[in-house]
Amino acid sequence: MDQIVVELFLLSIGASFVQRTTGFGFGIFIMTMLPSIMPSFGEATTLSGILAMTTSLIIVIQKYKYITWRRLLPILFTFIIISIGAIFVLRRMEYHILNILLGITLIIVSIYFAFFSKRIKVKTTLPVQVTAGTLSGLMGGFFGMQGPPAVLYFVSSEPDKDRYLAMTQTYFLAGNLIMTLARAYNGFFTTTVSIGYVYGIAGVIIGNLIGSWVFKHLSGSLLKYIIYAYIGISGLIFLLEA
């Protein structure tokens, strides 16, 4: 039990640091190990979601003035609808094939954006927002990792890193809240999840403080390439695990 507490604490520090520094990645980081220490995959995604939600809440309180709702609401509403549907079919999914496809997709996307990001101009049109929200909803509902599609949209559509961080964290805060309610309805919010949250919250706060310092020293262009690299590494991890 003591070992699990230490592992959860350290995982929460790392995941919160990544989220605060890059604007996403809490679920990607923590879900590489969390399923192995939780009773079920559904409980792991639930714990990941509420810890990530806490991280996002802290950031939203700090960056609320940078939110532009007209660029946020369409992608957010699409995400909510799709992710709820994905959660309801979670128990019937075969993860082996999905992990392979997810890993390949993340690697291709990260390479494409890293080399062609200067040529890519993401317009804040409704079709683009719906597409990003749909992909994000599927990844969030199935894997608890809704970040990459939304982040690629926001990092291209927002004019500076403060607005990028405000938009992504408001998106993740609202999305994780809805997904937590859906997971609770499906029986994934258990006593074990509640206890895990108590152990992980201190790590979330520590990781957030460290990440906040690092974020202040990052330029906008460097932040983009860190995001692309992290998405690619995440894809490689999925392939190796599959």
Please tell me what each predicted stretch does:
Residues Q3-V6, E43-L47, I97-I104, P127, ...:
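Alpha-helical transmembrane segments of integral membrane proteins
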Residues I4-L73, G133, G137, G147-I201:
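Small-residue-rich hydrophobic segments that form or flank transmembrane alpha-helices
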Residues T21, I61-K65, R92-M93, F115-F116, ...:
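Helix-loop junctions at the membrane-solvent interface of multi-pass transporters
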Residues E43-F115:
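Membrane helix-loop-helix hairpins that form the core translocation module of multi-pass transporters
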Residues A44, G85, V89-L90, Y95, ...:
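Hydrophobic alpha-helical transmembrane segments in multi-pass integral membrane proteins
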Residues V60-P74, L90-I100, I120-T124, F189-I195, ...:
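Interfacial helix-loop-helix linkers and transmembrane-helix boundary segments
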Residues F79-I87, Y95-F115, Y199-S212, G220-A242:
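Selective transmembrane alpha-helices of multi-pass membrane proteins
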Residues F113-S136:
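Alpha-helical multi-pass membrane helix bundles of inner-membrane/thylakoid proteins
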